[in-house]
Amino acid sequence: MAMIDLTHDWQLLAQNPAGGLNSSSLLLLVGVFLALFFAAVLGFFFLRYGKLWFQAFMSDADVQLLNLIRMHFTKVNPNVIVQAKVMVAQAGLNIGRRDGISTHRLEAHYLAGGNVMNVIHAIIAAHRAQIPLEFDQAAAIDLAGRDVLDAVQTSVYPKVIDCPDPKRSGKTTLSAITKNGVELRVRTRVTVRTNIEQLIGGATEDTVIARVGEAIISSIGSAETHFKVLENPDMITRVVLSRGLDAQTAFEIVSIDIADIDVGENIGARLQNDQAEADTRVARAQAERRRAEAIAAEQQMNARVSENRSRLVLAEADVPRALAEAFKAGRIGNVSSVAAAEGSA
């Protein structure tokens, strides 16, 4: 009926262009144009997103066509949101608009730069494994830069960390020395699973490796002999596990296993040998010093003997001169007569 009236108005306008249209006909014409415009817009969006909407409708994913239109203007990928909602709905999770994984919450996480599909996969895996994981918690972990799906998988299937890790430190064994001075080279494997509650702000694998290595070295160092460690390696692991090394970390230590123990050098014997060699060198140095002092004293005595000999030679050289002077002075004859007189008396 409206189309007939519109056609009639156009005919009147054509017959009487100067008279124009009345106000009611003009409003009707504008209304028809607006209706056609909105119908064209809706048709455009329906042709573009109708398949996604039908997929969501058939999957009971609670995604409306208006939501898809809003995503078009907010630069949100509707394929990702619809696929995520379908997966959540098929997994039997709560998709309620109030407290469930709603379309609005998925859009907000997408606009924040998060990985929506990774979060949904993690939540579904946690739900299957009966691990408590809410959407807000998973989204926060994802936005913090952690791989939430890998964290859930590690919680379900614990992974093994080598201590030390050759990829990080370049070393294959830990070196520790018992009290008797024998070096032990140990290779350890630490089984851990993710502690989702501590995943944000918790220490990483490097901290766990460092703590375990420090505890193992300390435990071996407190052993009296290396034989006790070789006989009972479990003694070390029990001590290490009792220290609570996984505190404030993103992991929970399941077990610590000694994979290999090798006996290295006898550090104590080597140190004793080095000390003995040092003492020998000191004794040799002292003996050499005493020998040098003795040689110096001998040379000094020889110098004194030579000096005394020279004095003796000088004294012997003065004897003939003294005798000659005595003959000249007649002291030798007087001395002889006096001696003869004393003899006769």
Curated annotation (Swiss-Prot):
Pfam families per the UniProt record, alphabetical: FloA
Key words, A-Z: Cell membrane, Membrane, Transmembrane, Transmembrane helix
Signal peptide: none
InterPro entries: FloA
Transmembrane segments: 26-46
Primary location group: membrane
GO cellular component: membrane raft; plasma membrane
Subcellular location as annotated: Cell membrane; Membrane raft
Membrane-related topology note: Single-pass membrane protein
HAMAP family in UniProt: FloA
Subunit structure: Homooligomerizes.
Family of this protein: Belongs to the flotillin-like FloA family.
Function statement: Found in functional membrane microdomains (FMM) that may be equivalent to eukaryotic membrane rafts. FMMs are highly dynamic and increase in number as cells age. Flotillins are thought to be important factors in membrane fluidity.
Name of the protein in its database record: Flotillin-like protein FloA 1
Organism field: Rhodopirellula baltica (strain DSM 10527 / NCIMB 13988 / SH1)
Gene expressing this chain: floA1
